[in-house]
Amino acid sequence: SKSMSLFGVTATNGKTTITYMTEEIFKAYQLKSGIIGTIVIKIDKEIEMSRLTTPESYDLQQYFAKMKDQEITHVSMEVSSSALELKRVYHTDFDVVAFTNISPEHIQLHDSFEAYFDAKASLIRTASKMSTAILNLDEQLLIPLAEETAAQVVTFGIENKSGTITVSDIRFSS
């Protein structure tokens, strides 16, 4: 993972959407990219169906090696709470990590909501000082994480206007 720019996102909902949107940004800049996520593993134009949101450690390293061999420079990756709890991404060198939302929908694999939150929060808490952590300030539980990471923090919000990035004047159209 050190040989490429790696973006990892955790959330209760929206991980897949975020990884696909991020890949579109990479493509807009003509960056050779890949996706690791719930639906597919995508290495440039090669697509394989996923078995897990975040592959087992050995498989994950195999995918990274294949991406390196194919000169992939940017990867967008979904990081599940179970993968974090089971240390599947331990020593994975993320350049950017994001935690965008949390709700008690997927706590069945954890002893409690607190354990579920702590698993997800570990992506932010263990981010290196050379990386960037993105946090949604509209999620009250995520706000303290800005002080619990060595990473450079970028915050955003729609309701909470104190973020690094704020959203306003939202218009929906069809």
Stretches with model-predicted labels:
Residues 30-44, 79-80:
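Short beta-strand-centered segment that lines the nucleotide-binding/catalytic pocket of NTP-utilizing
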Residues 33, 74-75, 153:
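Hydrophobic anchor at the start of a short beta-strand
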Residues 82-90:
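Conserved helix/coil segment N-terminal to the catalytic DExD/H
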Residues 1-10, 17-30, 164:
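Short, basic phosphate-binding NTP loop
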Residues 47-57, 105-114:
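Flexible beta-alpha connector loops of hexameric P-loop NTPases
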Residues 48-80:
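Conserved nucleotide-sensing/catalytic segment adjacent to the nucleotide-binding pocket
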Residues 94-174:
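Acidic, Mg2+-coordinating active-site environments of NTP-dependent enzymes
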